[in-house]
Amino acid sequence: MMVDTGVDHRAVSSHDGPDAGRRVFGAADPRFACVVRAFASMFPGRRFGGGALAVYLDGQPVVDVWKGWADRAGWVPWSADSAPMVFSATKGMTATVIHRLADRGLIDYEAPVAEYWPAFGANGKATLTVRDVMRHQAGLSGLRGATQQDLLDHVVMEERLAAAVPGRLLGKSAYHALTFGWLMSGLARAVTGKDMRLLFREELAEPLDTDGLHLGRPPADAPTRVAEIIMPQDIAANAVLTCAMRRLAHRFSGGFRSMYFPGAIAAVQGEAPLLDAEIPAANGVATARALARMYGAIANGGEIDGIRFLSRELVTGLTRNRRQVLPDRNLLVPLNFHLGYHGMPIGNVMPGFGHVGLGGSIGWTDPETGVAFALVHNRLLSPLVMTDHAGFVGIYHLIRQAAAQARKRGYQPVTPFGAPYSEPGAAAG
């Protein structure tokens, strides 16, 4: 059964023409037609940017669609290879690197971090375990005193954290908005001798046979193309707002203090200097199909397309022993942090785990149902900011409904990119 949702299912990797961004491109199993329509409604015009959505069911891609524009001017249509900076959704990728290392016996979650990274044992941190740090319980969330230049140097930040004295929230769940990444990269460097940017390639992109997962700016010869962030360009020049944010960060909010630094807003504008750094908690660049493929492997017991990405035992450990949902001391909302991912404090509306980023880009997996998805876009601080941070919940609800119907009545994986989507069995959603 073919379902027409307005998806242009020509197999092209980029799209020319002034109106290309107004159409949905890609493919989807017809059971997911309502999912595609909900996604398409997110990008009504040029000033709202663009994005992509990919869904996996039992290790098979069943949705792979994109729409909108990849630049602020609204001249460059989104393509299959467009990839925005996904902010904190990067943490899920970084955590997965650590799990790959643990799977090979290089890291034990119950071992002290200092066992691998001796410098980290300074100032009362000798007994902090890998699990503690991955649960955001290290007491090292604050950025007080760190300059923008410091944050653009990952080695400096790793050294600062290794020497730091834990704060009063040691042992309590307190979201490490930026420092989580350098804690993970320092640990990974200690056991591999490699930086996290290289490990993204070796531990994620290469075994998954995809180019669309990068830490920072992709190489010039990579097919992945960075989508520009769409946000009000006059915010950085607003002296009153900048002063207010600085005061808020240093006096009132631990959560804000964990992510604010001088020049934070300007850093993601223009050519985005953050892309040239290694910030493993925030500056990942990902296509939806690549991020969904990573989470699709986890949802499928650690395997995808015959590739053993993670052991079944490790995936089982990710789904078991998830702690009671308690209020996070920095975010002031209940979240379930477990080994680098988080759950959602909304009952059974969004089962599973993954990581959402600032603006609403997200990667998510539910091994109990075999469903995984990724939604990425380049919109930040737009008039739709509240919708962006809640919209993925509604889309995931539609995905779960469609997946249940697809299991009952059968489904057809989308055709691998590059082949005509109009061939038999490759239905456009």
Swiss-Prot record:
Q: What is the lineage of its organism?
A: Bacteria, Bacillati, Actinomycetota, Actinomycetes, Mycobacteriales
Gene Ontology terms, cellular component aspect?
extracellular region; plasma membrane
Q: Which gene encodes it?
A: lipL
Q: What is this protein called?
A: Esterase/beta-lactamase LipL
Induction pattern: Up-regulated in acidic and oxidative stress conditions.
Locations listed in the record: Secreted, Cell wall; Cell membrane
Query: What does the UniProt entry list as the effect of changing Y175A?
Result: Loss of esterase and beta-lactamase activities
Entry's Pfam families? Beta-lactamase
Q: What is its EC number?
A: 3.1.1.-, 3.5.2.6
Q: Which family does it belong to?
A: Belongs to the beta-lactamase family.
- Alphabetized Gene3D superfamilies for the sequence: DD-peptidase/beta-lactamase superfamily (3.40.710.10)
- Reactions it catalyzes: a fatty acid ester + H2O = an aliphatic alcohol + a fatty acid + H(+); an acetyl ester + H2O = an aliphatic alcohol + acetate + H(+); a butanoate ester + H2O = an aliphatic alcohol + butanoate + H(+); an octanoate ester + H2O = an aliphatic alcohol + octanoate + H(+)
Q: How does activity depend on pH?
A: Optimum pH is 7.0 (with pNP-butyrate as substrate).
Q: Which UniProt keywords apply?
A: Cell membrane, Cell wall, Hydrolase, Membrane, Secreted
GO biological process: one example: glycerolipid catabolic process
Its biological purpose is as follows: Shows both esterase and beta-lactamase activities, with a much higher activity against phenyl esters than against beta-lactams. Shows esterase activity against both long-chain and short-chain p-nitrophenol (pNP) esters, with a preference for shorter chain esters. Hydrolyzes substrates containing beta-lactam ring such as nitrocefin and ampicillin. Functions as an immunogen that activates both humoral and cell-mediated responses.
Temperature influence on activity is noted as:
Optimum temperature is 40 degrees Celsius (with pNP-butyrate as substrate).
| Enzyme type, top EC level | hydrolase
Instruction: Please tell me the species this chain comes from.
Output: Mycobacterium tuberculosis (strain ATCC 25618 / H37Rv)
Tell me which residues this entry annotates as catalytic.
S88 (acyl-ester intermediate)
